[in-house]
Amino acid sequence: SILAAVIAPVAVMAWGPARPSFTIEKPADYITFNSITNNPVIGGDEKDFVGIREVGSNANWTNNMKVQNGKEYYVRIYVHNNAASNLNLVAENVVAKLNVPTTTAKTVTVQGQVSASNAKPNTVWDEATFSSDNDFNLAYVAGSALFENNGMGTTKLPDSIVNNTGATLGYSKLDGKIPGCFQYAGYVTVKVKAQVNQPQEKTDIDLAKTVRNKTNGEKTWTETVSA
């Protein structure tokens, strides 16, 4: 029940907003996203629903990734309506967004959002951070956004996922409707490419000019000479 829900601390968490938490054994009795704390599918707490992994790697999803120049990385957003299945509560107008900053810096944080018009709260978000020893930027790889679930398999999403419009999700089709329960959950994946500024090598050459007066029989080079 709502009364049994626990408000989780957010002081050191890169997610929000603060909201009640639920468990597999005691799911929500209303529509809310990514608030179950013991989901083994994503390693425990669903509030940590944004992850990073290098394309082509089988490594675990992580919240922090040190980038290499020219490499591509997946950003994953988990999407799960936590309403108990027996309540038949369907989330409406479900939209996913990924904010990929265009800044150049040594750390760049991306933010994933999942929204629904009848969810409480309407929007939940989580962050993950890329880093490098040198300044870099992230570029969204156009056409890379996908949604994977049991209802549709893998479905292409529009590039609007990385702007304010976002991408509409769904279960059996992209109609914005996602019922409550694990079987209706899904994953959004997006590719980004790292462009690292390469440090410039020092090319300045210090030249020293020396002369000698051959007519005076000088055999050593000096910086000045008497005529």
Placement of each model-derived feature along the sequence:
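C-terminal segment of classical bacterial N-terminal signal peptides
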Residues: A4-M13
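Exported/extracytosolic protein signature
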Residues: M13-A227
